Amino acid sequence: MTHKQDAIPQIAILLGYSGASPFVALAILSILFEEPFFIEGLIVYAAIILSFLGGIYWGAAMKNLSQNEFTASLKTDLSISVTPALLAWGILVIKNLKVAIIFLSVGFLAQLIVDVVATKNGYFPHWYNALRIPLTAIVLLCLIVAYIYYEPLQI
């Protein structure tokens, strides 16, 4: 039985899955059309979303900040918040698209682990994992599909 506080807000479901739709569309397009454009689009979108997921920690840290106390916990939260963005930025300069997909997949998996632990420790609402886990599964599946089907042009 789910308590009301454990239920995922409908708007979070709507926006979360809407945010996953470009992953699905770009993965499908990358299969249908053998153009690097769709894989590149998938990589850029994945980098943006990975950055967004890290940024959630910045917002949460600012909300929890009281009287400008820069505790060790706050420093950790702020560090966690920028790490995915820095990783994503580095990935965007990788020329080998398959390598970029591998690094993005690792980044999403690592971020999910951090989020699951943070939620279990009460940092996020109880429902957050119930939303994040399936969304991350969709993202990883799309990245795996793109990795499998993408064949770089041999010149």
Regions found by a protein language model. Give the residues of each.
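Short, amphipathic, aromatic/basic-enriched membrane-interface segments that mark the entry/exit
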Residues: 5-12, 61-78, 123-129
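Alpha-helical transmembrane segments and their membrane-interface exit regions
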Residues: 48-54, 106-117
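Core segments of alpha-helical transmembrane spans in multipass integral membrane proteins
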Residues: 17-24, 43-65, 72-90
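Juxtamembrane boundary at the C-terminal end of a transmembrane helix
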Residues: 145-155
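Alpha-helical transmembrane segments of multipass membrane proteins
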Residues: 24-28, 86-93, 116, 144
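Interfacial loop-to-transmembrane junctions
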Residues: 114, 118-140
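The first (N-terminal) embedded transmembrane alpha-helix
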Residues: 9-30, 136-143
